[in-house]
């Protein structure tokens, strides 16, 4: 299954690396809404660390604000209900500094009550990690979180991968200690 064979130009722009000089004072500010809950996602700061703040309105009971430091720049955010439980999740995409631009997802599930529950994205391992050298792109597509990145072959430069693209679709599952994004399908093209 291909979650998104064609990325829109806007999604590509969100996922591109930011040159070092553009990092000074970089900010992100976006309001998202799902199932009656509004999420305000903001980041600010200088250098390779940003302060991420997520606040909500409309949830009953009110959800506690989330504040954390992220390594990189916030480049996008989406809300979804990947597990179809009637409660939204927030997915924030962070791009690391430097030419490699490692991607990270900071995500939280709204649970009954006012404490947001962290969602964990596992490290790439095994065959999924073969040829991986960063340049991640993330996007919610239907009921999965899709992660796409170029595949590098031995001898490829950081600027030119020759092995195509790998896309991994993750489904949201309940784990023993919280929510997990588990890989359910992998495509190469």
Regions found by a protein language model. Name each.
Residues 34-35, 80-88:
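Residues in Ca2+-coordinating acidic/glycine-rich loops
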Residues 44-45, 93-96:
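Beta-strand C-termini and the immediately following turn/loop, strongest in propeller blades
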Residues 65-66, 117-125, 181-186:
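Beta-propeller fold detector
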Residues 3-8, 13-17, 22-38, 44-47, ...:
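Acidic, small-residue rich beta-repeat scaffolds with periodic aromatic anchors
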Residues 51-62, 102-122, 169-175:
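Beta-propeller blade repeat segments, especially FG-GAP/WD-type strand-to-loop junctions
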Residues 67-76, 126-133:
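Repeat-based blade/solenoid architectures
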Residues 23-72, 111:
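Flexible low-complexity loop/turn motifs enriched in small/helix-breaking residues
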Residues 97-100, 157-159:
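Short glycine/serine/proline-enriched coil/turn segments at secondary-structure junctions
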